[in-house]
Amino acid sequence: MARSSFKLEHPLERRQAEANRIREKYPDRIPVIVEKAERSDIPDIDKKKYLVPADLTVGQFVYVVRKRIKLSAEKAIFIFVKNTLPPTAALMSAIYEENKDEDGFLYMTYSGENTFGLFV
């Protein structure tokens, strides 16, 4: 997977400090970075950083992303964490604990195609 543009734009120390500050201020929230997969023809998202309730499911978060990119109901969207499709019923807190980056953010990629083809 290509390196996140968020990671390229912000040095590690700044990302770590921001994630730590967020987690201290909002312990029941998950700091998430959402970016479009390369070569995907799906619309761009208007913002990359989200503060997600820990008890939100992946499926509920996919709904939030769909709304942000104004994707019509008949179009498919896939959300990946480390090139893998997480279970839609999984809690964001569980996905975060298993997959958070060294900087403290959870990185998710979305695409209109199942580009990686891996199910957990």
Swiss-Prot record:
PTMs per UniProt: The C-terminal 3 residues are removed by ATG4 to expose Gly-117 at the C-terminus. The C-terminal Gly is then amidated with phosphatidylethanolamine by an activating system similar to that for ubiquitin.
Keyword presence, Cytoplasm: yes
InterPro entries (alphabetical): Atg8-like (IPR004241), Ubiquitin-like_domsf (IPR029071)
Cellular component terms per the entry's GO annotation: autophagosome membrane; cytoplasmic vesicle; microtubule
Membrane protein topology class: Lipid-anchor
Protein's cellular compartments: Cytoplasmic vesicle, Autophagosome membrane; Vacuole membrane; Cytoplasm, Cytoskeleton
GO biological process, one term: mitophagy
Keyword field: Autophagy, Cytoplasm, Cytoplasmic vesicle, Cytoskeleton, Lipoprotein, Membrane, Microtubule, Protein transport, Transport, Ubl conjugation pathway, Vacuole
Residues with lipidation of kind Phosphatidylethanolamine amidated glycine: 117
SUPFAM superfamilies: Ubiquitin-like
Residues under site feature: Cleavage: 117-118
Region (Disordered), start-end ranges: 1-20
Presence of keyword Lipoprotein: yes
Chain residues in the propeptide: 118-120
Gene Ontology terms, MF aspect: phosphatidylethanolamine binding
Family recorded in the similarity comment: Belongs to the ATG8 family.
Oligomer status and interactors: Interacts with ATG4.
Function: Ubiquitin-like modifier involved in autophagosomes formation. May mediate the delivery of the autophagosomes to the vacuole via the microtubule cytoskeleton.
Protein name: Autophagy-related protein 8C
Species this chain originates from: Oryza sativa subsp. japonica
Lineage: Eukaryota, Viridiplantae, Streptophyta, Embryophyta, Tracheophyta
Gene for this chain: ATG8C
